[in-house]
């Protein structure tokens, strides 16, 4: 890449997501059609697909991939 060229950084993609209270999402992440419970943390490079459910007080760490229709209970560390 030449110094004069620019690039577009990837940000958080959130589409049709039900978010609880006090959620932290670190970019870049891709969340769509899922539910995230209260007091949860989503790290960078995480993808959570449609109909997945993340419980309360969960930590989903970097580079995690949560497939469609997966249910993760409360107080889990992934």
Task: Show where each model-derived region lies.
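Structural signal for interior beta-strand "rungs" in well-ordered beta-sheet cores
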Residues: 6-78
């Amino acid at each position: 890449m030449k110094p004069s060229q620019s690039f577009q950084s990837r940000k958080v993609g959130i589409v049709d997501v039900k978010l609880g209270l006090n959620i932290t999402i670190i970019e870049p992440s891709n969340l769509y059609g899922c539910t995230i419970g209260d007091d949860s943390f989503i790290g960078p490079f995480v993808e959570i697909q449609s109909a997945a459910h993340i419980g309360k007080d969960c930590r989903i760490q970097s580079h995690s991939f949560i497939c469609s229709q997966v249910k993760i209970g409360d107080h889990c560390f992934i």
